[in-house]
């Protein structure tokens, strides 16, 4: 995807989306590395779409639209109806609302649904999932690629932890690293560095011990 123009691509995507769903579209946005302006050549295009309601037929139609793009294997994201979005688990929804750059519509009305307890649960859930997955991977799968993915996921727990502790939500991972604790910065630095096979044991230890501390501190 050299010389890939995300702005032009989004315009084409938006036109096709409107042709397909028209005024049923309640929200369309971009999240992930492209939304933050931190994309690399291998980054996914992470789109968020909310319709008035979503049937399985709608998903089939949307799937056909995705398949019409040569970049279809790079497109991922979140699709839901309004009702599902309004009733989504708050600690999970919070990240979506804060991290998505709007193109059509807005998610601002959802921000009033959240409180500090929802943010804490988001941090705790993220740490618990990382602890379990990293332990399982170290003991059983022993998959370096899995560990790379876990460190990427850990960045979002770092970001939400910083948000809970300071009230400041920093979208950019690069900028975030300048404002977090030393231990959190270590997680971010490892997530952005190259992995070697001999890093597996030490980096597994670092992530497990970091997640363990968060679970203990933020258990409620």
Which role fits each region the language model picked out?
Residues 1-19, 23, 35-42, 52-220:
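Catalytic core of pol beta-like nucleotidyltransferases
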């Amino acid at each position: 995807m050299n010389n890939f123009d995300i702005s032009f691509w989004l315009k084409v995507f938006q036109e096709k989306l409107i042709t397909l769903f028209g005024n049923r579209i309640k929200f369309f946005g971009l999240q992930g590395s492209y939304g933050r302006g931190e994309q690399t050549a291998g980054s996914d295009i992470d789109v968020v779409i909310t319709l008035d309601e979503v049937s399985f037929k709608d998903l089939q139609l949307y799937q056909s639209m995705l398949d019409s793009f040569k970049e279809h294997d790079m497109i991922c994201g979140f699709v839901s109806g309004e009702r599902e979005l309004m009733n989504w688990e708050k600690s999970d929804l919070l990240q979506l609302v804060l991290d998505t750059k709007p193109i059509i519509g807005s998610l601002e009305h959802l921000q009033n649904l959240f409180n500090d307890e929802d943010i804490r649960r988001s941090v705790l859930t993220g740490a618990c999932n990382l602890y379990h997955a990293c332990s399982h991977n170290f003991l059983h799968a022993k998959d370096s690629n899995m560990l790379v993915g876990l460190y990427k996921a850990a960045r979002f727990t770092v970001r939400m932890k910083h948000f809970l502790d300071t009230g400041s939500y920093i979208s950019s991972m690069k900028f975030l690293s300048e404002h977090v604790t030393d231990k959190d910065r270590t997680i971010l630095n490892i997530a952005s560095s190259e992995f070697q096979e001999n890093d597996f044991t030490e980096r597994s230890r670092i992530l497990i011990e970091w997640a363990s501390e968060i679970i203990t501190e933020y258990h409620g």
